[in-house]
Amino acid sequence: ALSVLLQXSCTMCLFCCYL
């Protein structure tokens, strides 16, 4: 998922840190 790339970067991807 994108969370793997953004490492939970809520600033760029608000939902990624929850995936």
From Swiss-Prot:
Contains 2 disulfide bonds. GO terms for cellular component: extracellular region. It is found in: Secreted. GO terms for molecular function: toxin activity. This is Augerpeptide hhe9. The lineage of its organism: Eukaryota, Metazoa, Spiralia, Lophotrochozoa, Mollusca. Keywords: Disulfide bond, Secreted, Toxin. Expressed by the venom duct. It comes from the Eukaryota. It comes from Hastula hectica (Sea snail). The cysteine framework is XVI (C-C-CC).
